[in-house]
């Protein structure tokens, strides 16, 4: 790009940095980090491992918030200095380096800005993501497998760990259901944008007549909750446990021992399953976390409905409502029905490029809370 254009881009980035700086108390961040590090250096810190891990995680979050801002601030300062040098004496190699660094810093700023939109209580938690095909037979189960691939690709691109806790293959193709644990900081905050019904339109490869088909898949997303984060009483007599032989995605890594666990919460009928661990105990522990997450979600839904009734507002019920359409025929377009964001890059979306949709959703969600 021309030097004048580069300077305009740098100026825009500096404005964003100044805006972030006005809302960021670096001294308070440093004080909180120092306080936590002092606790970590005390004898007996690991006596309560759960509490210790919580302090470590909190410290890492604070450091990440501080260090990512300082890194961005330094990058923009370096870009400004490089542009000044080029204004005095043009250098082709330095100019190319400036263009590359501007592009990288713009992406880093977009990522930082996205993180600032995560304001909900459990946004920093791991996510539990469930995939359930709707009616439509093979076409729907195949669409479910496409979404499974899309979310795993997205998670891998963000360095999140993916654990497949449950995976049931379709009769002909695709999957009947799947449950993923997306492990990493802010996983739930990003993925809560995906909860709802995803509609898919294409010429079906399973239809010999080559007709256009519409299929639906429901995605449910919940935060993974630790025992100290929420109190949900689950009576032992209310839970039925079944064990079975585990098998990985597509029938891989089949276990000859019944280590997989399925829990049924009798009062609500909620069913969860885990087959990712090598022992029944490990899978039961994960399944219990998933059950708590589902019970929490159920209670939150009730509270939101009651609040909406009292305030006279219309509740946005994501589960059971269509949130996004993916059209591959007669044209190619993916459109979010809440934020209005759309793109013709269907291949990129199916390869996991969901960040523009997530960003648009978070901004839309914030605007719903603060309409002015």
Swiss-Prot record:
Coiled coil: none annotated. GO terms for cellular component: cytoplasm. Belongs to the prokaryotic/mitochondrial release factor family. InterPro entries: PCRF, Pep_chain_release_fac_I, Pep_chain_release_fac_I_sf, PrfB. The lineage of its organism: Bacteria, Bacillati, Bacillota, Bacilli, Lactobacillales. Methylated by PrmC. Methylation increases the termination efficiency of RF2. Keywords: Cytoplasm, Methylation, Protein biosynthesis. The gene is prfB. This is Peptide chain release factor 2. One of its GO terms (molecular function) is translation release factor activity, codon specific. PROSITE patterns: RF_PROK_I.
């Amino acid at each position: 790009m021309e030097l004048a254009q580069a300077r305009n881009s740098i100026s825009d980035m500096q404005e964003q940095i100044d805006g972030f700086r006005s809302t960021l108390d670096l001294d308070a961040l440093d004080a909180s980090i120092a306080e936590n590090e002092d606790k970590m250096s005390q004898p007996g810190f690991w006596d309560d491992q759960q509490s210790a891990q919580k302090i470590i995680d909190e410290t890492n979050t604070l450091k990440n918030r501080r260090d990512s801002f300082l890194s961005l601030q330094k990058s923009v300062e370096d870009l400004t200095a490089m542009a000044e040098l080029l204004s005095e004496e043009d250098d082709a190699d330095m100019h190319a380096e400036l263009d590359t660094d501007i592009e990288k810093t713009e992406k880093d700023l977009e990522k930082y800005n996205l993180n600032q939109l995560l304001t909900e209580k459990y946004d920093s938690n791991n996510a539990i993501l469930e995939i359930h095909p709707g009616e439509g037979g093979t076409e729907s189960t195949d669409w479910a497998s496409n979404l499974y691939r899309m979310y795993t690709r997205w998670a891998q691109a963000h360095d999140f760990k993916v654990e497949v806790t449950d995976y049931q293959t379709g009769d002909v193709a695709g999957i009947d259901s799947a449950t993923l644990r997306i492990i990493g900081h802010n996983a739930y905050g990003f993925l809560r944008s995906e909860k709802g019904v995803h509609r898919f339109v294409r010429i079906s490869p399973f239809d010999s007549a080559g007709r256009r088909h519409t299929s639906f898949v429901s995605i449910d997303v919940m935060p993974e909750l630790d025992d100290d984060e929420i109190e949900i009483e689950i009576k032992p007599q209310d839970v039925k446990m079944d064990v079975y032989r585990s098998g990985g995605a597509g029938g891989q890594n089949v276990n000859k021992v019944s280590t997989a666990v399925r829990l049924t919460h009798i009062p609500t009928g909620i069913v969860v399953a885990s087959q990712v661990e090598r022992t029944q105990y490990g899978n039961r522990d994960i399944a219990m976390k998933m059950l708590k997450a589902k019970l929490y979600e159920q209670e939150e839904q009730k509270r939101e409905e009651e609040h909406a009734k009292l305030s006279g507002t219309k509740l946005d019920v994501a589960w059971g409502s269509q949130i996004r359409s993916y059209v591959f025929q007669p044209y190619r377009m993916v459109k979010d029905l809440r934020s209005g964001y759309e793109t013709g890059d269907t291949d990129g979306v199916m390869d996991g490029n969901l960040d523009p949709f997530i960003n648009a959703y978070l901004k839309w969600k914030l605007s719903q809370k603060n309409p002015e």
